[in-house]
């Protein structure tokens, strides 16, 4: 897909760009006079009758696709009541398959180019607004029984307003219902912000699935707060590599 192509009624405005660990691509698209952010998932891909592979292989891939669809639609439905444009949660507005690929559409956000070091330089009152707005967004999720699952500074967009700044919480691809995380081998994200219980679950060292609740996000939020206020993550034993690992030591 390239600029000018149309996907499910969305006109692609720029060529897609690969992001993160190469698991997806994104660009901007227009529909009915409004611009959107659109993400193309590189995996899974849906095999049609002409796809290579045995019938058994294609059936296995289709089962995986069905599970992928169920997961995304479940989170989308859980957040349906807060899915309007303009809020501080940038949730899925549209999710669909086009050919073999899956796509997700969200509101387009004009974010300020501010990282944790830039936030540290802001007046404390501005910092406080940022801390409060991201916490409020997280509470909306948590009140609906949803764990974000990949909370980190790059998923907290900072937007300039007439009065200063606010935050927009994005990227719910790794979200799950509290106590119902995906299998350990399917969890992806940034380990720097993993909670101790999430580390234990992934390493299969005694943490059960039901123990992964909203608390995992609160651990990550604390790390983000530290970066926003000091410019650097909290100090811990370097041998542990990650804060969540250090907290389990």
Locate the predicted segments by residue:
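Catalytic-loop of the protein kinase fold
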Residues: 142-159
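Activation segment signature within eukaryotic-like protein kinase domains
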Residues: 130-131
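Conserved catalytic-loop aspartate of Hanks-type protein kinases
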Residues: 217
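ATP-binding glycine-rich loop module of kinase domains
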Residues: 25-73
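Activation segment/activation loop of eukaryotic-type protein kinase catalytic domains
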Residues: 159-192
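Short beta-strand micro-motifs within the conserved protein kinase catalytic domain, predominantly
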Residues: 91-102
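ATP-binding glycine-rich phosphate-binding loop
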Residues: 2-31
